[in-house]
Amino acid sequence: MGYVINIQAIKKQIELSPQSCGVYQMIGDKDKVLYVGKAKNLKSRLSNYLRYENLSERTKFMLSQVIKVEVLVTENEIDALLLEARLIKSLKPPYNIIFKDGRSYPYIVISKHNYPRIAQYRGKFKKGEFHYYGPFISVAAVKQTMLSLQKTFLLRVCSDQYFASTKRPCIEYQIKRCSAPCVGKITKDDYCQSVKQTRDTLLGRNEKVKKQLSSTMEKCSKEENYELAAIYRDRLKFLEQIQMQSMDFSFEKDADFFGIARKEDLACIGVLSFRNKDNYGSTPYFVENCSDHPDDEILSTFLIKLYNSANIPPAQIYVSDFVTGKEIIEQALHNVTHKPIKALHAKSKKEHNLLKFVYDNSQRSLEQKLTDYKNNLEKFEELSKIFLLPNIPKRVEVYDNSHTSGNQQVGVMVVAGKEGFLKSEYRKFTIKGEILGDDYEMMREVLTRRFSNNTKDVVPDFLLIDGGPGHISVVQNVLNTLNINVPFACMAKGSYRNAGNERFYMPNREDFTLKNDSKVMLYLQSLRNEAHRFAITSHRKKRDKQFFVSPLSKITSIGDKRKNALMSHFGSVENISKASLAEIQNVARISKELAEVILKHVDNKE
């Protein structure tokens, strides 16, 4: 395919560019930055764009939109690497390498509460709220470890709000994953001992915890308290399961191992993480549109992005021998993390085996991802034919609403692409209008808010609406008013509101149905079901939040931060009512007068 490229704009900048380090920007219409790149030699790097026959189709298409090129000269390669990362993060150029699942590592946290809870956490550290353990590279590893810890130590996972207001044990107690401190099924001292043992386990002190559990079990047996002894026996068994999860691989030092596999225009970077001598799991990160970039460059950019956030890097990372610029990576990571980090090649047999393991996993993940891409592309091709779309869709948005008799009304949007469901792009809309359960008006508000303001630059290729023929005019009216040209269809369930025999409604077209067992019908049902699931869970969260309202929420003279501090410290409104004025003043850092207002309020349960 031929593209018209503004050769003169590139040649002009080549003439002006020095043979030194820096960053260049490809700029298109309306000064939109299309691409940001770094180079050891700006003149040489830009000259490569004139070798047209060596460029990928994607790069050729990008160059056809370039109006001008700008460069920023830096002192050295490290500054160029960091500047490129900052510009990509702030400008989000559409033609730069896309890293998927570039979120921060997940952690396990234990709250600083009188009866601490254990939870999965991802994001910036909140000083004073939690003890953090990790990071874990894999979310699956966090969930598995959490489950084992719950079975072993029976810590609560409920919110502080629920803990303070509940009157009876929840399902977690019934299935033996919680000791129900909320209703006094365990003493505070015993619960705190369980918390301490959990923390020791997460810090790698498993042998210490095993000795404590064994000693307690033997003591219970001698006292002929066989029921309690059996409980500690089960705890020991679960603790051994936790240890077995990391027996296949271990490493003496905190370290991350990186491997990269490539095929077609996709790369997969695998990360294997060790903390406190334990294997914290691995996860694949996918890199799209990278055919024009060498492995060395992809990995360098990825490392800066990975550790330039809430992620806490280890003192050393291991990379394959193909990575030649180790010193540059070390200096760049030091600049963004303010910690000395060594980039190492494998030397010992164990190090080589771990690098091979992470590479092999990356290769398998890459093959699976490409298979998923192919399958989803086939589904999108079918959608294009059935709904007479102008192009094969790349982004499909599905909409649904949920409410209970007009209360806690929410609308949701789920997104699907060639990768599958794009959960990071889901949105939920709390209905603001006085609509009272009118599905049509709820959909009108949701779509109006979705396509207004700054969201027009992310326009989908197809909309699927959970609704019937009555929704057609509503959707069409919103899109016409906002000058949005997107094809859509409404999907209504069959006669008895069950899956199967769904009918589809579109503007200026007779309604139709599809074979129930066809692949495309099953795919459309999965899209609708995912939107329905997200709508229901969003609605329930909103409903439950309203149900579990603390009496403190009615006090307008103190803010949420102080209310949370009081609930976190005392555990319940009842405990606050028993506290002294001085205690309340100290915890919430408020005046005596305001403390008196709080006590009066919780005593009267106003």
From Swiss-Prot:
Residues 19-97 form the GIY-YIG domain. Coiled coil: none annotated. PROSITE patterns: GIY_YIG, UVR, UVRC. Its main location: cytoplasm. Keywords: Cytoplasm, DNA damage, DNA excision, DNA repair, Excision nuclease, SOS response. Gene3D superfamilies: 5' to 3' exonuclease, C-terminal subdomain (1.10.150.20), GIY-YIG endonuclease (3.40.1440.10), UvrC, RNAse H endonuclease domain (3.30.420.340). It is found in: Cytoplasm. Belongs to the UvrC family. HAMAP family: UvrC. Interacts with UvrB in an incision complex. This is UvrABC system protein C. It comes from Wolbachia sp. subsp. Brugia malayi (strain TRS).
